[in-house]
């Protein structure tokens, strides 16, 4: 990795606070089984990469940053399993969960 790439990554600011970071048992199991580091997805979520959400949800997330509404991201951890990340409207907590746990 070159120095300019590192500078660009470090200069990207977080778009909103996460509050307390929590995960459901299903999310923890998925991350463990797939040997996936949750921080990668949390970082993407906090920097505005919403993953695999419909365009209307992505637009709602952008508005939510300004208006203080809930923010939802969805990421494929493997070919068939998704991880959702939801930051509460009041920014008190961010939860990692499976869609079926919602």
Label every model-predicted segment.
Residues 7-72:
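Compact soluble domain cores
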Residues 66-102:
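Short, compact, well-ordered microdomains
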Residues 2-10, 17, 84-87, 97:
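Charged, low-complexity intrinsically disordered segments
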């Amino acid at each position: 990795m070159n120095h300019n790439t590192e500078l660009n990554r470090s200069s990207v600011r977080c778009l909103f606070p996460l509050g307390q970071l929590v995960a459901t048992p299903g999310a923890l199991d998925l991350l463990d089984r797939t040997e996936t580091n949750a921080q990668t997805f949390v970082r993407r979520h906090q920097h505005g990469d919403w993953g695999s959400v419909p365009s209307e949800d992505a637009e709602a997330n952008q508005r939510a940053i300004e208006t203080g509404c809930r923010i939802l991201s969805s990421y494929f951890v493997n070919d068939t399993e998704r991880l959702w990340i939801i930051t509460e409207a009041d920014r008190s907590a961010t939860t990692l969960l499976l869609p079926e746990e919602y």
